[in-house]
Amino acid sequence: PVTEDTPFGKAENPYGATKQTGEILYDQFFRNRPTKSGISLRYFNPAGAHPSALIGESPTQNATNLVPVITETAIGVREQITVFGDDYPSRDGSCVRDYVHVVDLARAHTLAIEHLLQHKNDNRYEVYNLGIGEGVTVLEAIFAFQEATGVQVNYKIGPRRPGDVAAIYADNTRI
């Protein structure tokens, strides 16, 4: 699991590099401004929707995140899902990710703001992981969807994608 104190390694892709750079800049900003404080919330893989459907994933173009890709395949928008790699060191050979519900993310934002407004943060800059703290493989997510809905999802195994890490999930004990 990744803790908030895990040192940054080399980013595997531009998205990861921007996340690292942002945290470094925030840390420097708040360290040098004693009257300011801030919190970074590290999302792992947001998924799901609020029951009202006011927040959640509803891509207007081709989805790239796993849950909407599964959904698009189930309803026939896509012919099939490509599972990128089946030779990772995981339970079934597919990548492992930590999925966190969007309602939990919204609640975490509310709590972070309350924490800052009540001046409860001991440090001027704090980082919190937002994840469930355990990994789910891509194939497990597909099979769970099928079991929950009774809808078969057509998938195929493809080659690994450059930059994909085998497994990443949160150590969420700090939050």
Annotate each predicted stretch with a short phrase:
Residues R33, P51-Q61, G85-R97:
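Short, charged helix-to-loop "capping" segments that act as catalytic/coupling loops
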Residues H50-A63, I70-T73, E79:
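Hydrophobic, Gly/Ser/Ala-rich alpha-helical and linker tracts in large acyl-processing enzymes
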Residues Y26-D27, A49, L116:
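Enrichment for repetitive, rod-forming helical segments
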Residues T3, V67-I175:
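C-terminal substrate-binding subdomain of Rossmann-fold SDR/epimerase-dehydratase oxidoreductases
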Residues P46-A49, L105:
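Conserved sequence/active-site signature of Rossmann-fold short-chain dehydrogenase/reductase
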Residues P1-N45, L54-N65:
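Catalytic helix-loop patch of NAD(P)-dependent Rossmann-fold dehydrogenases
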Residues P7, G48-P51, Y88, G135:
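Active-site proximal helix/loop that lines the substrate pocket
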